[in-house]
Regions:
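Small-residue (G/A/S/T)-rich helix-start motifs and N-terminal tracts that mark the onset
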Residues: 1-116
């Protein structure tokens, strides 16, 4: 068994309708690759994980936030990081996430490393 975790999204993603937006992204990505997923059902998890990451990225872009769950741990005896360097952003609603999806997909397409 494998566990996939995405810590990309800002806290502002916890808003009404955001789960519906995620469900739509997952459904759209799965539908686009239907035959491929029928041939290899193990790819469903990767497709869903990609949708979750894209959802979080779009939320971060909409909120103008670089906040995410996976922070470098603070260890005893190490210099403190300047927390003010992290942009908290601003509250968003589900339609803000939808509006940011094209930019999120563009960013992913321009930074992707495709395997042959």
């Amino acid at each position: 068994m494998r566990t996939l975790v995405c810590g990309r999204a800002p806290a502002f993603l916890a808003t009404a309708g955001a789960g519906d937006v995620l469900a739509g992204i997952i459904g759209a990505l799965l539908a686009q690759r239907a035959q491929e997923l029928i041939d290899d059902p193990t790819l469903v998890a990767e497709m869903a994980a990609g949708a979750v990451y894209t959802h979080g990225l779009a939320a971060a872009m909409a909120a103008h936030s670089d906040q995410h769950a996976w922070q470098t741990p603070h260890l005893y005896g190490e210099p403190k990081q300047d927390i003010a360097q992290s942009a908290c952003g601003h509250p968003i609603i589900a339609s803000d996430v939808i509006a940011a999806l094209p930019s999120a997909f563009d960013l992913l397409n321009t930074t992707a490393r495709y395997e042959d």
